[in-house]
Regions:
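Short glycine- and acidic-rich boundary segments immediately preceding or forming the N-terminal edge
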Residues: 1-14
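Active-site/substrate-binding loop(s) of hydrolase catalytic cores
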Residues: 3, 21-26, 35-167, 185
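A short acidic-Thr-Gly-centered motif at the start of a beta-strand
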Residues: 13-21
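A broadly conserved detector of short glycine/acidic/proline-rich loop/turn motifs that flank catalytic sites
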Residues: 14, 90, 193-194
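Active-site-adjacent mobile loop/cap segments within catalytic or ligand-binding domains
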Residues: 141-143, 170-213
Length: 213
């Protein structure tokens, strides 16, 4: 449950259980509630996954909207129901109490938020092969992990966005740092163009990449 008692939906491939030994691909959208492009991508992906269940061999977990409080707010907010930027709240070795503004508030302590705690627990429980989270800002594929990770290249080839090693500025307490540096789980961050007027174009940008994965 979110800080405002909203349910956070989770879906997974029918052949797997939420326990160790399945090494799924763990994916999520809506980390920042004011980035609807990431939710649109997750929803398109979920439709495709459910329509092609018998063809997909990979184990997968998908959370369409992690920050349901921020996404449901009017206006939508980057932060969660407690005013915390979830992608600055992971218990990473580089977590910092400092932030460059209210939108980036990292929380009172590392891993303080229920959404972050749920992802950390899910990572420990299922030991994902790698993770993909969906955002929107400037178009790019951010890979924190082995530079030859083929899945990142599939996505890059599908959408035409370059693979970058970081977003271009420090992100203490981020999933990228916690996942790869601290846990050795490769992290792919999809950054779609922000403020799109037509969200229906998002899923087609990445469909071929996910089919190849």
């Amino acid at each position: 449950m979110s800080p405002k008692n909203n349910s956070i939906e989770l879906y997974h491939s029918p052949q797997m259980k939420l326990e160790s030994g399945f090494s799924p691909i763990l994916m999520m959208g809506g980390v920042h509630g004011d980035e609807p492009e990431g939710v649109a991508l997750a929803e398109g992906l979920l439709r495709w996954l459910t329509e092609n269940t018998t063809k997909i061999r990979q184990n997968w977990i998908l959370i369409p909207c992690l920050n349901i409080d921020g996404y449901s707010a009017n206006p939508r907010t980057r932060t969660n129901g407690n005013g915390v930027d979830l992608n600055r709240n992971y218990p990473a070795s580089n977590w910092s109490p400092e932030s460059k503004g209210e939108r980036y508030y990292p929380g009172p302590s590392p891993g303080s938020e229920p959404e972050t705690q749920a992802i950390v627990q899910l990572m420990k429980l299922t030991q994902p092969k790698f993770m993909i989270h969906f955002h929107s800002w400037e178009p790019m594929i951010v890979l924190t992990g082995p530079p030859n990770l083929k899945e990142a290249h599939y996505l890059s080839e599908s959408c035409g966005y370059k693979i970058e090693g970081n977003v271009g500025y420090p992100t203490p307490g981020s999933l990228s740092h916690y996942g790869w540096v601290d846990q050795k789980t490769p992290i792919i961050c999809i950054e779609e163009q922000e403020k799109l007027k037509d969200l229906s174009v998002v899923w087609p940008h990445f469909k071929k990449g996910f089919e190849d994965i």
